[in-house]
């Protein structure tokens, strides 16, 4: 590399002093070092050299070197607030979950593939949704019992549940943050002209749908979704906002128990391969009690909770009184006048009590007579 030639012995010594290598040294394998680590070790050591030890030309190099380092540190400080602003923005979408489902998007409609349990679950969850909606509906249409109803399918995936609801007559909007899932769903519904008119798919999150669909839906379906979201309470609040007063929320999910960890993750994912590895995170599982404690304060009254059990040998689901594994929940949004803010209710209570006390006093009664 560098020899005595043009640089001269003085220039070579200067380069060696600044840490750019020694021509006579044996070449060492490169070391991967981050920029911050390098700045804290090599550059700091070099900057400890006294300017008068370098001579006139060395002092100029030293000053230029220090100025460049100062500029780099300023750039870093300007970037920090933007990074912090981005990282603190809240969303119900977990980016790690998105990556998992991106890799599985092409297998949605394989009835014997990775999503076989979801195909089989339709035998229970579709009637569960239909029957509970009919309890609140005044009109019934033979053959199309959900005709006239508008349903939001959150986390619709490839449309496994969206299409059966559309066949029952409902107008269904399926949303999913994974673009690959929506492409698969769009392609599959195109084979049925009737479904093509009744079903609409969008690549978006639930909180994005709130902006344009407040109080628009008769029902919101979140089947096998809440165990994949971040900020569960924010997710429930968004469900409330897009529902019409008196609308229904349907949730199927996994309970947070030792049994659900043993069977839902260890057996189903790691041993039997019924579910792809990494599909579930036990810390995100939610118990019926925990779910109800979030639903009720947010204006959603729980009507039904029922256990679901999957038989991996037959490939079928059945209802159960045991909710320690999977369960389905149906909640109804309260009417506008029924769901008052706590502060408003307390204020009305205090006003009523004050009125009762004042009207009961002798002086007030005397004034009322006159």
Curated annotation (Swiss-Prot):
InterPro entries: SAM-dependent_MTases_sf (IPR029063), UbiG_MeTrfase (IPR010233)
Gene Ontology cellular component list: extrinsic component of mitochondrial inner membrane; mitochondrial inner membrane; mitochondrial matrix; mitochondrion; ubiquinone biosynthesis complex
Cellular localisation: Mitochondrion inner membrane
Source organism superkingdom: Eukaryota
EC number: 2.1.1.64, 2.1.1.-, 2.1.1.114
Transit peptide: first to last position: 1-86
Positions with a binding annotation for Mg(2+): 224, 227-228
UniProt keyword annotation of Membrane present: yes
Topology in membrane: Peripheral membrane protein
Keywords: Acetylation, Magnesium, Membrane, Metal-binding, Methyltransferase, Mitochondrion, Mitochondrion inner membrane, S-adenosyl-L-methionine, Transferase, Transit peptide, Ubiquinone biosynthesis
Binding partners and assembly: Component of a multi-subunit COQ enzyme complex, composed of at least COQ3, COQ4, COQ5, COQ6, COQ7 and COQ9.
Entry function: O-methyltransferase required for two non-consecutive steps during ubiquinone biosynthesis. Catalyzes the 2 O-methylation of 3,4-dihydroxy-5-(all-trans-decaprenyl)benzoic acid into 4-hydroxy-3-methoxy-5-(all-trans-decaprenyl)benzoic acid. Also catalyzes the last step of ubiquinone biosynthesis by mediating methylation of 3-demethylubiquinone into ubiquinone. Also able to mediate the methylation of 3-demethylubiquinol-10 into ubiquinol-10.
Protein name per its UniProtKB record: Ubiquinone biosynthesis O-methyltransferase, mitochondrial
Organism: Mus musculus (Mouse)
């Amino acid at each position: 590399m560098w020899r005595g030639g043009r640089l001269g012995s003085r220039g070579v010594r200067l380069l060696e002093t600044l840490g750019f290598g020694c021509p006579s040294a044996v070449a060492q394998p490169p070391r991967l070092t981050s920029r911050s680590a390098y700045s804290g070790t090599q550059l700091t050591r070099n900057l400890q050299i006294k300017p008068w030890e370098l001579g006139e030309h060395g002092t100029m190099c030293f000053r230029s070197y220090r100025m460049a380092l100062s500029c780099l540190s300023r750039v870093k400080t300007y970037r920090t607030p933007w990074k912090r602003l981005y990282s603190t923005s809240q969303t119900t979408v977990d980016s790690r979950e998105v990556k998992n489902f991106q890799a599985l998007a092409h297998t949605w409609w394989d009835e014997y593939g990775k999503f076989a349990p979801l195909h089989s679950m339709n035998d229970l969850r579709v009637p569960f949704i239909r029957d509970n909606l009919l309890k609140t509906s005044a009109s019934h249409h033979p053959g199309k019992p959900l005709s006239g109803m508008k349903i939001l399918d959150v986390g619709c995936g490839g449309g496994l549940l969206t299409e059966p609801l559309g066949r029952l007559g409902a107008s269904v909007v399926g949303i999913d943050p994974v673009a690959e899932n929506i492409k698969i769903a769009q392609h599959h519904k195109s084979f049925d002209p009737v479904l093509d008119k009744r079903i609409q798919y969008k690549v978006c999150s639930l909180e994005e749908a709130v902006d344009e669909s407040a109080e628009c839906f008769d029902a919101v379906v979140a089947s096998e979704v809440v165990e994949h979201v971040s900020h569960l309470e924010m997710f429930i609040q968004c469900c409330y906002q897009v529902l019409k007063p008196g609308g229904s929320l349907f949730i199927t999910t996994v309970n947070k128990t030792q049994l659900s960890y043993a069977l839902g993750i260890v057996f189903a994912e790691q041993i039997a391969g019924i579910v792809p590895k990494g599909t579930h995170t036990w810390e995100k599982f939610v118990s019926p009690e925990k779910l109800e404690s979030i639903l009720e304060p947010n204006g959603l009254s729980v009507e039904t909770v029922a256990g679901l059990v999957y038989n991996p040998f037959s490939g079928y689901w059945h209802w159960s009184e045991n909710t320690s594994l999977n369960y389905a929940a149906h909640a109804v949004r309260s009417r506008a006048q029924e769901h008052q803010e706590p502060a408003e209710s307390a204020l009305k209570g205090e006003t009523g009590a004050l009125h009762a006390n004042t009207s009961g006093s002798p002086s007030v009664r005397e004034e009322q007579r006159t």
